[in-house]
Amino acid sequence: MKFKTRLLVGGLFLPLLLGRNVHGQAPFYQGKTIALIQAGEAGGTGDMRVKAVIPFLRKYIPGNPNILVEYMPGGGGRKAANYIFGSARPDGLTIGTVGGVVANAIQGQAGVQYDLDKFIYLGAPNATSHYVFVTRGELGLNSLEKLRAHAGLRVGAHAVGHFVYITGRFFAWLIGLRDPRFVTGYSGVELDANLLRGEIDSRANIADTVLQRNAELLTKGLVHVHAILEIPKGDKHPHPRFASLPEIERFARSDKESKALAMFRAFRLVGTPYILPPGTLQERAEILREAFRKTFRDPEFHKEYKKLTGDDAAPLLPEEMEKAIRELPREREIVELFQKIAGPDALPPR
């Protein structure tokens, strides 16, 4: 299988006599290369999160293996998840990091060829987040009333099923946009550029990404910011521009709508999980789980994560992630509503 981009992280040669265990046997991972399958493009926020993790993961895996990042975008994470589930060898040398892997499975999205409950979960660095909905400043939509009155707003996103796509759909649905059009197929960086060029009118984005990558959009008045999604609910963003925004659940009209949004919050709470193929040898899986625990507890990791992403790391440890996935709401009526919101068809009536 060909991958779009490859990035080798770490030294190519390690002294063979280093890192031996108490019995004189070299650790399994010494001299090995781990393939880290990333379900996304290079250069976006997700890529920065991975780059923050890699050096610490190498540090805490006995034997300090090389880590080769292989970018595998497509299908809102389904392409990468299907590969890890069905094609990757369960030898402990393939790790995936896949946004949408949980939501796609619970929704029953077309193209899902994996069993969510059979992956081995290693945790995630980003269990909390804030998403904002922005429109191009030139449109003059500087109030919710003007936003609702504007017909045919072009909402840019990644692929159907991607977190940013679903978030944009929730904003459009709950705010009550008139006949929004969803334009997909962009990376995060492309969305920013196309918004400025006027090829799209609006997008959902991570609040800290706006501050980190596109602060001039705010300072120069190039965008209007309309609402925020807090994950978890009640976790206020510290920036004054975002702290005063209406939280998206304010626009829900029924308990059913609130539950659909709560399901999405739960999906996002598990973040972009690191996963292993089903059947990975238990001993190697535990080595990797412990390496992730140590990474997420390392104060230096938190500093590096902040530097690269602009956000504070909020890790979910392996055992916490497994518990969160077991307890995800799977009520059929709510799943069906969520699926309509997250899918390619017109938004459901309210």
Placement of each model-derived feature along the sequence:
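A short beta-strand structural signal in non-transmembrane regions
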Residues: 271-277
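Bacterial N-terminal signal peptides
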Residues: 9-19
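Sec/Tat signal peptide C-region and signal peptidase I cleavage site
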Residues: 20-24
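An extracytoplasmic/periplasmic, membrane-proximal ligand-sensing/linker region
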Residues: 30-32, 220-221, 225-226, 243, ...
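Conserved hydrophobic/amphipathic secondary-structure segments
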Residues: 26-271, 329, 343-349
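Bacterial N-terminal signal peptides that target proteins for export
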Residues: 1-9
